[in-house]
Amino acid sequence: MTDQPIKTMTGAEALVSTLADHGVTACFANPGTSEMHLVTALDHEPRIKSTLCLFEGVATGAADGHARVTGVPAMTLLHLGAGYLNGGANIHNARRAWTPMVNVIGDHAVPHQRFDAPLASDVVGMAGPNSRWIKSADTVAQAGELAAQAWEASFGPEPGPVSLILPADTAWLEGGKPGATRARPSLRAPDPARIDAAAAAVKSASKPVIIINGTALTEAGLAQAARVKAAGIRVLTDTFFPRQARGAGRFVPDRMQYFAEGAMADLEGSDLMLIAGTQVPVAFFAYPGKPSVLVPEGCTPMMIGGPDTDSAAILAALADALGTKEAAPVAELDVPGAPTGALNAAAIGASIARHMPEGCFVSDDGVSNGLPSFLMTQRARPHDWMMLTGGAIGQGMPLALGASLAAPDRKTLCITGDGAGMYTNQALWSMAREGANVVNVVFVNHSYRILNIELARTGAGNPGPAAQELLGLGHPEIDWVKLSEAQGVPAANATTAEEFDAALERAFAADGPRLIAAHVPAR
């Protein structure tokens, strides 16, 4: 009897196995020729579920949504630099959400790179600006170890997307082995000196506020925020946050206003601004004669902890330092009645508050029409709201796809504008293929309405015919029902409040994805 030879791992197998060893359970992929051995490695790794996405922006947005639900990174599989660039907008959004994500980017075999083949590019130069960490596994011995490093780096010091480049020959050569197991890095604990300084500043302030994000927006974190509110500190969230626990039984913080002048007016008179789990607030854009830093005159900003800190623990420590025994009230369930008449953003918000089931995840890419839905669901059944953090529209459907696959037993609602939805409508195909429990609500106004608003705010003048063509989505109008059904997702039009309310009730009751094209006024 002869001994059977021991099969060694390929570089691709070492990479995939290492990520699985570290708890990665999802891969959102749009592979090409250079990634074929990674595809095979995924086929042999039952711990990771692979989902095909027809556009890289869907893959990266879905990985973001998956991680926002699970708290651990998902893997993306992207085809060289061009594939990375296609997914770049939603990687940018994930970076702004501090979302851990491991982007595996295939590349040409190392000996082939010097020939400048048509798909050759500077992958490091392209991926570097949006990556917290980036390395290339140029030898098979590096593949597993760099995969472990990538996973670890996605958690910090500041969480976010990382990029691991895998040349084709590294993927196919044997001699790989899994990387050494890493422990998950923790967010930084509160700094006692900063807590004491903040408590002292609060006691001498007349109108203190605190801006929060991160773990402070979990259910447990909001319970601590309610204690801070009871101590006399106004609590506000960032304008856009990765995820917030909301609805009945949860404390309702205020939210920073979007427009600079509105935010400054809202904060007028504040003399102390504490920061926990985020950064000093700044305006989304510069406008003539408007401030960029949203701190009122006479107000002192004080950083207690940035995005790399456990902001829920900061709030608890601050409340303790202030001797707070009470807590501010939480939201009570208040479901509105059925809306009637014309269909508009307020009617849609009322229907969402009526029918959204407990435990629902909401992916908000609603742009100009999203605010009423946010406000009207404050006292709805308990749910989690996920927002567009980086301003690159087209995140809504991919984020919802990833969230749904991370929590298939919970419903996910996507609200998106028709302009935003067209960036990544291919997510519908993946939803249909996976049977994702996503209800998509598309605000159809045949316009980039937010840009019409911004045109006036920037002082760019009155739009003429050419400007109107650049800001409108008519000629031809997009038929969202046909677009959705062509990708396997049942859909319906709604033109009145009654039609929308009935369609939404049916959509939440159904299994699998649904889409409602909600026809709302352009202005």
Regions found by a protein language model. Give the residues of each.
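Phosphate/pyrophosphate-binding active-site segments
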Residues: T2-I6, A141, I165, K177, ...
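N-terminal alpha/beta PP-like core and its mobile active-site loop of ThDP/TPP-dependent enzymes
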Residues: T2-K325, V439-N440
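Active-site diphosphate/adenylate-binding microenvironment
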Residues: A12-T25, N30-T33, L38-E45, P329-D409
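A general structural motif
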Residues: F55-E56, F115-A117, P185-A197, A216, ...
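Short, glycine-/Ser/Thr-/acidic-enriched flexible segments
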Residues: G83, A109, D169-A171, T215-L217, ...
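Thiamine diphosphate
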Residues: V104, H112-L119, L371-R523
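Generic enzyme active-site microenvironment
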Residues: L236, S363, I415-T416
